[in-house]
Amino acid sequence: MRLVPTSTPAAQPPLILRLSVTDQVLCELRRRILHGVIEGGEPIPESQCAETLGVSRVPVREALLMLEREGLLQRDRRGRTVARTLGGRDYEEILTLRLEVEGMAARLCADARTEQDLEALESNIAAFAAAKSAEELASLDAEFHGILCSASGHRWLLTAWSTIRWPFEALLVKNFRSYIQATSLEESKVSTEDHRRIVEAIRSRKPHESELLVRQHISRWTDWKPA
């Protein structure tokens, strides 16, 4: 497992830090998995991880269990904790699930949304348009769809979304990297206009149009399946 510092610029720390040691370990390991620093199939030894991060094994053990529940880790045949390898089948299954879950979310959101929800979506779109890397784009894209699901007001729908949220972002990082390599950073932001149209339909309280736009948006990614 590679736990050496990476060249990815660190995010600016918030004004008030209240994360527990477990949460800090969770965020750091999740970031490394999402960004591909820890690759699929790579073991994550609890003791080595604790030593490298300068913490005890207890918060590491708790963080690894959380990451396993999030779908980013799994147990291999030898019982080791390894980063989950996400491939074409995972992509297809997550995509088809997103079509149903997020389509429904958009439809419900058009009726249930608040002004705060609209502000959160608009703020996300602005940040997405200003993003400077595949990792930022993936994080903000996943965040946009998470806001939709949360704003739907449907608790079980949000639970369903949470089961795919992090694997979805991990796959998005790969997709945006491929898209940027094939085109450019700016061209990779084609989702910006899709997101704006979705928000306008939701703002206008048009449930069926909102659902249709989300489904069309998700379907655009069909051809960008990872190997």
Predicted regions and their residues:
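Short helix-adjacent coil turns
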Residues: 36, 116, 128, 132-135, ...
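Amphipathic alpha-helical dimerization/coiled-coil segments
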Residues: 104-127
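C-terminal all-alpha effector/ligand-binding and dimerization domain
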Residues: 2-7, 17, 173-227
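Short linear motifs at protein or domain termini
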Residues: 1-111, 226-227
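Hydrophobic, amphipathic alpha-helical faces that serve as interaction scaffolds
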Residues: 97-110, 143-182
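Amphipathic coiled-coil alpha-helices
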Residues: 101, 124, 131, 140-147, ...
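Hydrophobic packing residues in well-ordered alpha-helices of helical domains and bundles
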Residues: 94, 118-121, 137, 141, ...
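A ubiquitous short alpha-helical element
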Residues: 86-91, 106-111, 129-132, 178-186
